[in-house]
Amino acid sequence: MFLLAHAGITLGAAYAIEKTVNCRPFNSRPAAGPADSRVAPAPLRVDYRFILLGALLPDLVDKPLGHILLPDILANGRTFLHTLLFLVITILAALIIYRQKRAMWGVYIAFGVLTHFIMDFMWCDPVTFLWPLYGAFEKHPGISAWILEKWIQTLFEEPCVYLPEAAGFLILLFFTTRLIVQRKVTAFMLQGRL
């Protein structure tokens, strides 16, 4: 998967979850009487900046690390941040942050990382996904030289790539247009609201 699919589809999924959670029938039912002490929970307010960060984080770190900084050692764009170990650490850190500070930003990052793994089908690459159980990451020598050409070719020839990219683009276009029309770009930048 490329940038648009990771960003757009993850953003759309998080938005759908937020709207579903905030549209519970429980919130719309009147109290049964004075003895009914049900209190509607506070609405979920997602900070989409952290969702986007989590969705892009594995590629933001692993691609430069494997192709630019350490191409002779790693020669792979899916390394440390594409492993189950990283996902587990991210989720545990999110839970600790939430428990200690009642802050949701770690959960949002973990959600973004999880969706990144799902879209990359990481379980299909057990050497990377289960690292370090199977030893070192597989090397793809020479890939850095033709990576841009290969990405462009794959983008236009593989439906499993260009369809999610197109969907991600449309979702990002929808949210960007909406933010501009409603003049909420600043609110998104400062508070992560859509």
Please give the residue ranges for each predicted region.
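N-terminal membrane-targeting hydrophobic helices
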Residues: 1-194
